[in-house]
Swiss-Prot record:
Residues 681-691 have a biased composition (Polar residues). Consists of an N-terminal domain, which is sufficient for the localization to the septal ring and is required for cell division, followed by a linker domain, and a C-terminal domain, which forms the translocation motor involved in chromosome segregation. The C-terminal domain can be further subdivided into alpha, beta and gamma subdomains. The alpha and beta subdomains form the DNA pump, and the gamma subdomain is a regulatory subdomain. It comes from Lactococcus lactis subsp. lactis (strain IL1403) (Streptococcus lactis). Keywords: ATP-binding, Cell cycle, Cell division, Cell membrane, Chromosome partition, DNA-binding, Membrane, Nucleotide-binding, Transmembrane, Transmembrane helix. The keyword ATP-binding applies. This is DNA translocase FtsK. ATP binds at residues 437-442. GO terms for biological process: cell division; chromosome segregation. It is found in: Cell membrane.
Amino acid sequence: MSESKKMPAKKKTTRRNTKKEQQKKAATRKMIAFFVGLLLILFALARLGIVGVLLYNIVRLFVGSLAIVFLLLLAGLMIISVFRKQVLKENKRIIPAIILTFIGLMFVFQIRLHQGFNETFHLIWSDLMAGRVIHFVGSGVIGALITEPAKALFSVIGVYIIAAVLWLVAIYLMIPGLFPKMREDLHQRLAKWKEKHAEKVEAKKAAKALAELEKKQAVAEREELPEAAENSLFTSAPTEIPINIPEAPFEENETESPVLAEVPLDDEPVNFSNTNNYNGNYKLPTIDLLAEVPVKNQSGERENVRKNIGILEETFKSFGIGANVESAVVGPSITKYEIKLATGTKVSRVVNLSDDLALALAAKDIRIEAPIPGKSLVGVEIPNAEVAMVGFREMWEAGKTNPSKLLEIPLGKSLDGGIRTFDLTRMPHLLVAGSTGSGKSVAVNGIITSILMKALPSQVKFLMVDPKMVELSVYNDIPHLLIPVVTNPRKASRALQKVVDQMEERYELFSRYGVRNIAGYNEKVQRYNAESDEKMLELPLIVVIVDELADLMMVASKEVEDAIIRLGQKARAAGIHMILATQRPSVDVISGLIKANVPSRIAFAVSSGTDSRTILDTNGAEKLLGRGDMLFKPIDENHPIRLQGAFLSDDDVESVVTFIKDQSEAQYDESFDPGEVDESQVGTGASNTGSGDPLFEEARNMVIMAQKASTAQLQRALKVGFNRASDLMNELEAQGIVGPAKGTTPRKVLVSPDGEFIGGVEE
């Protein structure tokens, strides 16, 4: 019995000891698990050995490149749960706030990756199998699973908004009193603003009431005055009328224009051009005639820009070039990335990487501007995914050209969105070249339309040469034309020579009146007309437009080149300006002499760097995209400027031309008429020589009747170029009609007017 009584006592003691031991064992296991977990986290964070890299990649599989953040948060929560458990019990919102913040980060990291679920898993799995950590993998498999549906439903911007909302909610959970405090501050500021606004309104009401009171007092005092005083008040009232004149400045022009219109009628014996007759009723074309081109939203390019910045920096780094993208400017057709190079990097190394950068960016073509003028940066111009068309109406409205500058023309939109204009009077001549379909003809039509929308027919005249017969024929019969559009290349050289003769006549006129240019002459005419009853007409500006220079150079190269060179050298002061366009920019068309006298150039897309150097003296045009993409090199710039030309449809041109034709008829100037040209007169680029020249008999008779002979005399009388006149003179000498040349004196004529041979040639 004693043994049976002792046994239960031993069992009770054993049960009591087992509970304590279990608690100790549980605490021990918990601490062991804590330290083992913390040790594994440290191995994973430091990527120590194969185990550390493996653990880190396993975490990356689920949360991607946020593995470091996840492991640090996990370690922090473990430490708090073991040593500061009370903190989590008192602040139950901390864990939900951390989870929301982490989910927002997962959205952002996965969007930055620009990859889907399969690509993300492949990148992580390749690193896991290779035992390395190389690629940026977004937010892992979990991030891809939650981001891809959100991106499909709400777009990229929507995902960013969701992430921002999650972060705001997390901030609210962690700092509950923050938003109420902000709301109170906002209410206080609104209350202060309302008080100030109410005070201003009350002050205005008080001032208005005071003004009405003073007005009533003035009326009461006026009623008490005698009639004489009342009459005196009414007589002085008209002195306030001139104050309103500056508010309507256009009324002055409307009153002056009929006077200008009546000038030729008062002075009928003077047989001047009648261009001023319709200036009084002539109205300039309005912007409403042009169609609006919808403005394209380019916000979608931002994502491409961010992606390209990373590719550019990585590509430069792979070639051993230290470079950082300072800024990116999105233009209508291209985006320009401004890149800062590391000190000591040669610019030539960057220029030579053009093809490699195009390959990395998967771009059609890129242009490198090294360096950017005025900056210590290199520009890399990359085509946009979609081109934003620039409308001519939009450019005209934004350009805001000076109405007094008749030849100031909006040309195109620059990279920063600004409108670039140029004044043809300062150029003073312009060469436009580019391959077929590059936008050359649209640019020429834009220049002509810009002038037509600003200038009266008496202010600007055109002489147009269009051997293709389809580009400029739409402008026939407008009152701004000197003669109908010249389509025969054989007549074009004569028409250009007529312009040269007009230039010489203007210089003789300037010399007679003691002025230096057309502006001084017209100013003198204005003063004379203001002081005298007899009226003189101002000289108009003349714009010569040749749409296809190559065709003219094939038919009569010497005569055309001579006329262009003479106009290029002297025509600016005479108010004559040229626009030469060609789609074949070769050296036999754009010769060195033509380039020297036409300093301002526009290059559209060409096929080779050789053509680009022919136009601009530098490479670059071969990298253009076409459809209005141009390089503009004015006379006052050393480097070409890239612009996107405006689109002007044929319907818009037709609308403007029809509006002008409906107002007045064309009145051509016969002095510019090239006349009829015999097909046998002009060879293939060189002047005719020998007795087969049809003008030989006319030259022979003219020399015999005048009894003096010189090449300049033949040029003026026969309206031919210098080479042809020289050949005629040599033939006259060979047939014994004139003597040999003796310096600058005219040659002696050896045949009398009666046909007798005089002879007497001095040795």
